[in-house]
Each structure stands twice: as C-alpha cells, then as structure tokens.
C-alpha cells in the first residue's frame, strides 16, 4: 500500500474540518449566549472538545495504521489518545475568557487538534517510530522551525506534559 498525495491531503482536510467545525460551533454558542456564565461555557466547550477530539483521534488512528501498513512496520493497531479532560478545558476557558474571549473558538479548535496530534505521537512513542512536523497550509514561523528539525525518534522528550508540543488552532 502507498499513501498517495490525494490520501494525505484528504486526511489533512478532514482533520482541519473537524477543528474548524468545533470552533465554529463554539462561536455560534457564544454569539447568542455571551460569555458571562462560565460554567455553561466550560460545559459546552468540553462537549465540543470531547466529541470532535474523539473524531480527530480516530482519524489519526486510521492514518497511523495506513502508514504502518505501507511501511510493513508490523505494529499493533493505533490507539486513540484521550481528548482534553474537563479540567484542561476549564483552564483554557477561564484563561481565554479573562484575556480575550474572542479566542475561545480557537482554544476549542486547538484542543480538538491536539487529540489527533497526541494520538500520532502516543503511538509513535509506543512503537519506537520516527516522526517529523510537516507543515501544510498556513503555518507560523515557529512551526516552520520545528519542521526544519527533520525526522526525530519519538520519545517522551517530544511530549510536553504528555501532549504534542506547540499545537495551534490555525497552523496546519
């Protein structure tokens, strides 16, 4: 099996749609309800992060398995990483609400995206695989710098607090 450019682009597009949709739904919630009720904001954000984060993790599992098959790696099936827990979502909502409430949708998108990145890295660490940041689309200078590091052995050093490091909502 070979991973074609078309397959890879479809994968990236599907992940991006999940991230964007979660952010859009958060925006659609905030527009009529506002940000005054923190408990409701956290509960809604947590629901979005859980639902769309699970989708992101599942897509990452599917691509990881396809890549492993293409490489004849002989590794176990990929296991999804857990989406952000309630406490993580609450911290994001509280910090973002107090600094710049307009960024709440981006915070939700970032946590959704992180579930997919965490899934890939969790399985790469388990399997002793190598990984690389591969920018696609709009990418910040720091992500470009990370990509310039090339292939790296997956290990606990690549994880920050158990998560993929430097995940932006808008960097592909």
Where are these regions (language model features)?
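Domain-core detector
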Residues: 1-168, 172
């Amino acid at each position: 099996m070979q991973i074609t450019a078309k397959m890879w682009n479809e994968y990236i597009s599907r992940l991006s749609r999940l991230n964007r949709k979660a952010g859009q739904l958060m925006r659609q919630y905030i527009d009529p309800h506002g940000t005054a009720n923190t408990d409701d904001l956290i509960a809604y954000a947590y629901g979005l992060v859980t639902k769309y984060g699970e989708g992101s993790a599942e897509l990452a599992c599917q691509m990881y398995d396809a890549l492993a098959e293409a490489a004849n790696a002989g590794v176990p099936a990929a296991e999804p990483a857990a989406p952000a827990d309630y406490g993580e979502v609450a911290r994001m909502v509280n910090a973002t609400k107090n600094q710049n409430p307009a960024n709440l949708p981006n915070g939700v998108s970032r946590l959704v995206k992180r579930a997919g990145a965490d899934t890939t890295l969790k399985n790469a660490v388990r399997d002793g695989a190598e990984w690389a940041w591969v920018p696609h689309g709009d990418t910040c200078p720091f992500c470009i710098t990370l990509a310039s590091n090339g292939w790296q052995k997956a290990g606990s050093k690549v994880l920050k607090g158990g998560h993929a490091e430097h995940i932006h909502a808008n960097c592909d």
